[in-house]
Amino acid sequence: FFQWSATVECHFLNGTERVRFLVRHVYNRQQYVHFDSDVGLFVADTVLGEPSAKLFNSQPDVLEKNRAAVEMLCNYNYEIVAPLTLQRREPKVRIFALQSGSLPQTDRLACYVTGFYPPEIEVKWFQNGQEETERVVSTDVIQNGDWTYQVLVVLEISPRHGDSYVCQVEHTSLQQPITQRWEPPGDVSRSKLLMGVGGFVLGLVYLALGIFFFLCSKKGQPDPTSPGILN
């Protein structure tokens, strides 16, 4: 089984200030000859590539076509692609609690980050304010197919009462990191219960004050049934 392939590359420095065009010829996963616009010729990378380089360089039309690719291919496509590739997209972050079938409680947290561009991103897990690095597993950054990317970062946990977990995301599109917080369900329910009780007690206090001021105002008014002075 033999495999041959060729790749075409455009390298840009400071926009189109300096453009380099490359064509790489690969045989069985080994590059044997390539064209470099900085050189203007085909260059052999192995002994196998020497006859090919000699053949390509002996054909003026082949050389002219590859030399013209800097303008006709690289610069032309740069004007089309640059607005898309230079636009930054902010990531969206969600936390999912995962549970193994044999365990009665959550044992993993997944921080799902998607919709961001460029692909360089940093996702961190914190437990009770301390960064976790030992129990963290991450997928590669994956393309979404619309010039944006996604990544999944999973943290193994043994949740206890009072624990809090935070997923923090840093990206060039953000002025400050995004943080998503997760607490064990018991703690969340307890917090909601305490908030509900607190609100109920506060409501009773306001009700008592309202009744008190109402009664005071009634005492200060004259009784319309009391006998008055006849004029």
From Swiss-Prot:
One of its GO terms (biological process) is positive regulation of T cell activation. The keyword Transmembrane helix applies. The keyword S-adenosyl-L-methionine does not apply. It is found in: Membrane. Residues 90-182 are annotated as: Beta-2. Keywords: Adaptive immunity, Disulfide bond, Glycoprotein, Immunity, Membrane, MHC II, Transmembrane, Transmembrane helix. The chain crosses the membrane at residues 195-219. Residues 91-179 form the Ig-like C1-type domain. PANTHER family: HLA CLASS II HISTOCOMPATIBILITY ANTIGEN, DRB1 BETA CHAIN, MHC CLASS II-RELATED. This is Class II histocompatibility antigen, B-L beta chain. The lineage of its organism: Eukaryota, Metazoa, Chordata, Craniata, Vertebrata.
